[in-house]
């Protein structure tokens, strides 16, 4: 092989060079464009796929928001964590992982409420059929995603921008698809740039503990 290459070089024939510019390589997918003149959709409000249990919990926390105890957090498909005063991104081809489906009810159906006094972020979560892991149950990775999203939102609302440094999940009881669970997270302590949080996932009626977790976040600004 080496002798053959040497002969080609000796005769002035150049071997083809592999293109190293990654930007010139064709993509394996095409991202559709979602340009719209309409106001961005808030996914954190009820739609027709929400079950009675999810609606009941939503209404319960909305009642708490009237007294100022809880505050509903808007949810958009192009913003990781909504911050008041910062308009949601529009005309963006990328989508937030938990809001990347066009059909309601088949993936991540959830809404979040924040309690500033208790440093708690609660997420009401109804997993759809596209999140299946073991037959009939929610994939563990999807559960971890929602824990990361909920604890991260709580850290952001208390401390500003953060990044996940560590996530430890203890799965205790599987979560059936279509059921409603409460993801209850709390910022436990802050040490310098480190934000320590805890989290539990319980059934809608608090009768079963599905998951426990801890997460460590690092504040982006000192």
Curated annotation (Swiss-Prot):
Which EC class does it fall in?
hydrolase
Q: Which UniProt keywords apply?
A: Apoptosis, Cell membrane, Cell projection, Cytoplasm, Fatty acid metabolism, Hydrolase, Lipid metabolism, Membrane, Mitochondrion, Mitochondrion inner membrane, Transit peptide
Source organism superkingdom: Eukaryota
Enzyme Commission identifier(s): 3.1.2.2
* One of the Pfam families matching this protein, by short name: 4HBT
GO terms classed as biological process: apoptotic process; fatty acid metabolic process
Is this entry keyworded Protease?
A: no
Q: What is this protein called?
A: Acyl-coenzyme A thioesterase THEM4
Native species of this protein? Xenopus laevis (African clawed frog)
